[in-house]
Curated annotation (Swiss-Prot):
Membrane topology: Peripheral membrane protein
NCBIfam families associated with the record: lepA, small_GTP
Pfam families: EFG_C, GTP_EFTU, GTP_EFTU_D2, LepA_C
Residues engaged in binding GTP: D20, H21, G22, K23, S24, T25, N137, K138, I139, D140
MF terms (GO), sorted A to Z: GTP binding; GTPase activity; ribosome binding; translation elongation factor activity
Family, as annotated: Belongs to the TRAFAC class translation factor GTPase superfamily. Classic translation factor GTPase family. LepA subfamily.
Record keywords: Cell inner membrane, Cell membrane, GTP-binding, Hydrolase, Membrane, Nucleotide-binding, Protein biosynthesis
Principal location: membrane
Native source species: Fusobacterium nucleatum subsp. nucleatum (strain ATCC 25586 / DSM 15643 / BCRC 10681 / CIP 101130 / JCM 8532 / KCTC 2640 / LMG 13131 / VPI 4355)
Protein name: Elongation factor 4
Protein EC: 3.6.5.n1
Catalytic activity: GTP + H2O = GDP + phosphate + H(+)
């Protein structure tokens, strides 16, 4: 049946929504209604297969699933749902999944309305010329205002919302209406069945037994089991060992016809051969041009990831390679730290992405890790000479080498917030060195603030602070803007007079003292006391800007002296003093793992 389904009866669509607006629940109901998943196998968030996805209530990996639906007009349709993430960090996952669709369901919470993150994904869908169907979800909530949300969709996004589908995925209301809207309003794929094969790779993951499983959308031609295919960028030739669809588990069909979405297995053992966004064509009859318009993933946040036990270094590298297989946006290169030993400098899309990767390394691969404070990429030049890009404070040039010019990346951010919290948001953006651009009133209760902000200020704790200052009501999205010259300095943290490279950070001159002092204070609380005094200092070049001292243990050496000559006691105290001095000069301070973790979690 799948092999002979006509293009006019196929629909490829995605679901766009802000976190918590009910995207995964709608996907669950569609699977249930079309009988793709039996009641026995049904569980919440069925497409969110990772435990982490369920715990955090978010979608991290793109997933594809094929549904078969008999419409009211009596015809059978093949509906390919590509479930995409909704968080700002995973915008690349969204962009490549949207390229495999002709339409998108825009899910908006009837009580919360349009959020900033929804906007970012909708604009991506519009860029890809997708037909967008507005769906107002959670209409059963007491606070639901569907008519107001319709006006918002029209005013803020500029989409007509008269025929928006009203639904409550939780209670199964409006699911049939959604399916009928998909069939009648999303266009069918319109490709050439007789042209040379052209297929888009929109995701891939590594299976321990079968190698790389590649998610593809067939545009022109078709892919059959036994075909010889070629990957465009690497010119690597492969044989298709299996082709099929996700329903929602893998189901072999031996052929993927024009306009279909499914998977192929070619026995490839590394994802570097099947890069996301690449084009597949036939060896016998190749296409003339590859598919255009894919942006490669760009790492925005960098951090060192080190195994707690040096024996785990190789294991960590293998784990990162496997994760990179499923995640084109993760980058890593080996690096060495005096304090932490051998590890990797990893590039992430954002802080949530970093948190998820580190958590997956701990859970799925049982590796105990230490991760350093995240930083961004700076452009540095000395005496206006050649520009160098650095993402690690250790690479920061020495202030004595000449006139240093540093440029840092800025983002253009939009915050949608209830009007009673506008003051709090403006205050936060000013603290984070933001440049005010504009303020628009979306309706009588909400405003949209636009700011330019340094990316470095965003990656640490901006999102958490924004949520706490607006009681969780604000939503935020951003895009990279440009590099600007800033007055930045490198601050070293010295423990017992020795710099600990893992604690070094780059900060704006105005914030260097506060952040340095906060780290010193935190370390003085978590580093255990020793037999000798431990100074903890923050240094800007050779200038100490903050200091905390961990007092030494004092052994009562004169406890055994009962009465007697005072000189005897003095002699013992002098001997103790000498011993402590010698201990201090040769003693090594053991820095516990909690110290690294507490500095990472430290909020300004």
């Amino acid at each position: 049946m799948e092999a002979i389904m006509l293009q006019k009866n196929k629909r490829n669509f995605s679901i766009i929504a802000h976190i918590d607006h009910g995207k995964s629940t709608i996907a669950d109901r569609l699977l249930e209604y079309t009988g793709t998943v039996s009641e026995r196998d049904m569980k919440e968030q069925i497409l969110d297969s990772m435990d982490l996805e369920r715990e955090k209530g978010i979608t991290i990996k793109a997933q594809a699933v094929t549904l078969f639906y008999k419409a009211k007009n009596g015809e059978e349709y093949e509906l390919n749902l590509i479930d995409t993430p909704g968080h700002v960090d995973f915008i690349y996952e969204v962009s490549r999944s949207l390229a495999a669709c002709e339409g998108a369901l825009l899910v908006v919470d009837a009580a919360q309305g349009v959020e900033a993150q929804t906007l970012a994904n909708v604009y991506l869908a519009i860029e890809n010329n997708l037909e967008i169907l507005p769906i107002i979800n959670k209409i059963d909530l007491p606070a639901a205002e569907p008519e107001k949300v319709k006006r918002e969709i029209e005013d803020i996004i500029g989409l007509p919302a008269d025929d928006a589908v009203l639904a409550s995925a939780k209670n199964g209301i409006g699911i049939e209406d959604i399916l009928e809207a998909i069939v009648h309003r999303i266009p069918a794929p319109n490709y050439d069945e007789d042209a040379p094969l052209k297929a888009l790779i929109f995701d891939s993951y590594f299976d321990d037994y079968r190698g790389v499983i590649t998610y593809v959308k067939v545009l022109d031609g078709n892919i059959k089991k036994g075909d010889k295919i070629k990957i465009w960028s690497t010119e690597k030739e492969l044989e298709v060992l299996e082709a099929g669809i996700f329903s929602p588990t893998m189901k072999s069909t031996d052929i993927l016809s024009t306009g279909s979405v499914g998977y192929i297995i070619t026995g490839v053992k590394t994802i570097h051969d099947t890069r996301v966004g690449d084009t597949i064509t036939s060896v016998k009859n190749p296409a003339l041009f590859p598919l255009a318009g894919f942006k490669p993933a760009q790492s925005m946040v960098f951090a060192g990831v080190y195994p707690l036990f040096t024996d785990d270094y190789e294991e960590l590298r293998e784990a990162l390679e496997k994760l990179q297989l499923n995640d084109a946006s993760l980058t890593f290169v080996p690096e060495t730290s005096i304090a932490l030993g051998f590890g990797f400098r990893c590039g992430f899309l954002g802080l949530l992405h970093m948190e998820i990767i580190v958590e997956r390394l701990r859970r799925e691969y049982n590796i105990d890790l230490i991760s350093t404070t995240p930083s961004v990429e700076y452009k540095v030049s000395i005496d206006n000479q050649e520009e160098k890009v650095i993402d690690n404070p250790c690479e920061f040039p020495d202030p004595g080498r000449g006139k240093i010019t540093i440029q840092e990346p800025y983002i253009r951010g939009k915050v949608i917030v209830p009007k009673e919290y506008v003051g709090n948001v403006m205050e936060l953006c000013q603290e984070k060195r933001g440049i005010f651009i504009s303020m628009d009133y979306l309706d009588e209760t909400r405003s949209m603030l636009s700011y330019e902000l340094p990316l470095a200020e965003i990656v640490i704790d901006f999102y958490d602070k924004l949520k706490s200052r607006t009681k969780g009501y604000a939503s935020f999205e951003y895009e990279l803007s440009e590099y600007k010259i800033s007055n930045l300095v490198k601050v070293d943290i010295l423990v017992s007079g020795k710099p600990v490279d893992a604690f070094s950070f780059i900060a704006h001159n105005d914030n260097a003292f506060h952040r340095g002092k906060a780290i010193c204070q935190k370390l003085s609380e978590v580093i255990p006391r020793q037999q000798f005094e431990i100074p903890i200092q923050a240094a800007l070049g050779s200038k100490i800007i903050a200091r905390e001292t961990i007092k030494a243990y004092r052994k009562n050496v004169i406890a055994k002296c009962y009465g007697g000559d005072i000189t005897r006691k003095k002699k013992l105290l002098e001997k103790q003093k000498e011993g402590k001095k010698r201990m201090k000069s040769i003693g090594n301070v053991e820095i516990p793992q909690e110290a690294f973790v507490s500095v990472l979690k430290l909020n300004d």
